[in-house]
């Protein structure tokens, strides 16, 4: 028995295939899903979705969104997603360093919009870098 996984962003379908197991980056921590999982909806955080198929793991970088598990079908709706194998790790690492610098420049800003944006940029850069290194 397998799962059907669909990962959708507003501008593209990133993944639409079967999987043996998936690990979702939910807002409450990592969530493993196997065939026969109970029906549920969960919020998705910035992070890496891991997909096991035929003994091989693939990674998908995600920004926030939602996931629904229903009858061995998992649908993930996010603002942005990209397959780890399509991410240039050098570019992802450069973006991560840039985001760290941007956040450090705003560290004394309290909860200013600039600091919140810098933290969001850092979270996205971390997810893309991790996904680029996972494949």
Curated annotation (Swiss-Prot):
Bias type Polar residues, positions: 101-112
Top-level taxon of the source organism: Bacteria
Main location class: membrane
InterPro entries reported in the protein's UniProt record: ATP_synth_F1_dsu/esu (IPR001469), ATP_synth_F1_dsu/esu_N (IPR020546), ATP_synth_F1_esu_C (IPR020547), ATPsynth_dsu/esu_N (IPR036771)
Biased composition (Basic and acidic residues): 89-100
Entry's Gene Ontology molecular function annotations: ATP binding; proton-transporting ATP synthase activity, rotational mechanism
Membrane topology: Peripheral membrane protein
A family per Pfam: ATP-synt_DE
Localization per record: Cellular thylakoid membrane
Disordered: annotated span: 89-114
Keyword presence, Ion transport: yes
Keyword Ion transport: yes
One GO cellular component term noted in the UniProt record for this chain: plasma membrane-derived thylakoid membrane
Keywords: ATP synthesis, CF(1), Hydrogen ion transport, Ion transport, Membrane, Thylakoid, Transport
Record function comment: Produces ATP from ADP in the presence of a proton gradient across the membrane.
UniProt similarity note: Belongs to the ATPase epsilon chain family.
HAMAP family: ATP_synth_epsil_bac
Subunit structure: F-type ATPases have 2 components, CF(1) - the catalytic core - and CF(0) - the membrane proton channel. CF(1) has five subunits: alpha(3), beta(3), gamma(1), delta(1), epsilon(1). CF(0) has three main subunits: a, b and c.
Protein name: ATP synthase epsilon chain
Organism the protein comes from: Prochlorococcus marinus (strain NATL2A)
Name of the gene encoding the protein in the UniProt record: atpC
């Amino acid at each position: 028995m397998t799962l059907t996984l669909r990962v959708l962003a507003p501008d593209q379908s990133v993944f639409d295939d079967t999987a043996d197991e998936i690990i979702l980056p939910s807002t409450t921590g990592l969530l493993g899903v196997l065939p026969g999982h109970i029906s549920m909806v969960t919020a998705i955080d910035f992070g890496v979705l891991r997909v096991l198929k035929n003994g091989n793991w693939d990674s998908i970088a995600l920004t926030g969104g939602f996931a629904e598990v229903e009858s061995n079908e998992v649908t993930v709706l996010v603002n942005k997603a990209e397959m780890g194998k399509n991410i240039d790790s050098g570019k992802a690492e450069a973006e991560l360093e840039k985001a760290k610098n941007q956040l450090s420049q705003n560290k004394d800003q309290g909860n200013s919009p600039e600091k919140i944006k810098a933290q969001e940029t850092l979270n996205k850069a971390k997810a893309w870098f991790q996904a680029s290194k996972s494949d």
